[in-house]
């Protein structure tokens, strides 16, 4: 009996302990939900945040003063960090909220005038002339306004494309082919202009042929050691690497090749090239632990000890979106299914390394890419996950600050908070992601997501 009594006491104690543990786990779950801003998503609250920013930007003199004097990394004429980003946000807001913001938008466009008159340094999408053209084209009212200046920009870009790419000695470097600085970004702008400028179509095809030449060359997309951006990369990749990102890697040219076909622009052997290029991305050595590398060491000696963040610049989110574009362009159900499986794998992770709400490597791009993909797949579990990401983003919102969302990065183990306005790393990218989240309209029209080659 004593033994039986002891067993009963032990079992009862274990039961109590289990209940305590369950209660503890429940409390931890509540705390976790609290930590990510677990509030019921109220679309009206999101709209209020967006409308407050519209009101702020509509007071042009005050907004300009605060932005120019308090924003870090402000670069006035660039799409990534300047006035073109404001123009894109207001243009998108005008369509979603059915507001007449034409006069406000025009005032910000006028601020670009002095820079255009004195000459823009470079032709790139994120920091050059095509970025200004991109913003003006999106803001153009049914393609009637700003056409004169757009035609001038188009002509300069077309001339640049032919002059630059007629050089047979071109080296394979991200600054030549990527979205940020290279021809993937310029090509995406030209794709938006093909209906209004025949030469834009010719220049775009020239870019696609350039990509095709790289792909079938001896070293194809290998970026040599001397063309690595950072000294640490020169150490890690002595014989070079293949960049597998969307911002600086092969996903940019591949996405543009797919998008061009989807829009009826093809070069000789386009479909075969797109198939081969997509197959190249799927090489098994480009993956580690079922995730794509950000950069593949050609010597296969360097294996990073970190997990790649699933934002825009790198990560499986970009891989997923690019494969979806290729699948649609080629009408290939296998690629589409693969994209779907990657999407499910992404949402099964916690993605807690996305510490910043901003776009480049943060939650805003994570939300936008997954939300865009789920418009096609329409998976309920993805919709639930998207709501969780929105809550995380909203938890970073500051009502008191002139900058509603800050960019966050780690530096020597400490979180560093920076006030930035621009689309790429600042609050505008976050606000555009939230605007896209609440937008229920058909977005087959040209839109800001084109600049990231998400669409």
Curated annotation (Swiss-Prot):
Sorted UniProt keywords: Plasmid
Annotated InterPro entries: Epidermin_biosynth_EpiC, LanC, LANC-like
Gene3D superfamilies tied to this protein: 1.50.10.20
One Pfam family it belongs to: LANC_like
Functional description taken from the UniProt entry: Involved in the post-translational modification of the lantibiotic epidermin.
Coiled-coil blocks: none
Similarity section: To B.subtilis SpaC and L.lactis NisC.
GO biological process: peptide modification
Gene from which the chain derives: epiC
Name recorded for this polypeptide: Epidermin biosynthesis protein EpiC
SUPFAM superfamilies the UniProt entry points to: LanC-like
